[in-house]
Amino acid sequence: MAHVLIVEARFYSHLNDMLLDGVRSALDAEGHSHETVTVPGALEVPAAIALAADSGRFDAYVALGVVIRGETYHFEVVSNESARGIMALTLDGLAIGNGILTVENEEQALARADKTRKDKGGEAAKAALAMLALKEQFGIG
């Protein structure tokens, strides 16, 4: 079984609790172990994954957070740069499921975070496991 690190940006804690519930449920259902670390915001998620990868303790990673559009350009910066950082790590061979929601409003975030609705947390966990399986299929790991 895999050992998975969940990296969560807690800026919107009530929404992240929902995402985290979905991730943990998906991993527990498959019998995988997991740990969770918290970072201040979505921009810090890729750095935390990179640091954890250097430890060699984890097989896969799940990135969690919520970015809600506001009145400034900050939304674009955080959304684009966090996604770019995660993509760079995946291209370096890490198995990562990206569960950082980028939405227009809290209603959209609630629909996506709730595991009884869109369950984007659970989907991110399954994506990480799928990428780990692909690595194993290619004999990488």
Curated annotation (Swiss-Prot):
Which residues does the entry assign to the active site, renumbered to this chain? Answer: H74 (proton donor)
A GO cellular-component term linked to this record: cytosol
Q: What class of enzyme is it?
A: transferase
Please tell me where (2S)-2-hydroxy-3-oxobutyl phosphate binds in this chain: E71, T72, R112
Top-rank taxon, per record: Bacteria
Keywords, A to Z, come to:
Riboflavin biosynthesis, Transferase
| Pathway(s) | Cofactor biosynthesis; riboflavin biosynthesis; riboflavin from 2-hydroxy-3-oxobutyl phosphate and 5-amino-6-(D-ribitylamino)uracil: step 1/2
The keyword Glycoprotein appears for this protein: no
Q: Which GO terms describe its biological process?
A: riboflavin biosynthetic process
NCBIfam families named in the record:
lumazine-synth
Say which family it is in. Answer: Belongs to the DMRL synthase family.
* PANTHER family noted in UniProt: 6,7-DIMETHYL-8-RIBITYLLUMAZINE SYNTHASE, 6,7-DIMETHYL-8-RIBITYLLUMAZINE SYNTHASE DMRL SYNTHASE LUMAZINE SYNTHASE
What the protein does comes down to: Catalyzes the formation of 6,7-dimethyl-8-ribityllumazine by condensation of 5-amino-6-(D-ribitylamino)uracil with 3,4-dihydroxy-2-butanone 4-phosphate. This is the penultimate step in the biosynthesis of riboflavin.
The name this protein goes by in its record = 6,7-dimethyl-8-ribityllumazine synthase
Which species does the entry assign this protein to?
Sphingopyxis alaskensis (strain DSM 13593 / LMG 18877 / RB2256) (Sphingomonas alaskensis)
Taxon lineage: Bacteria, Pseudomonadati, Pseudomonadota, Alphaproteobacteria, Sphingomonadales
Name of the gene: ribH
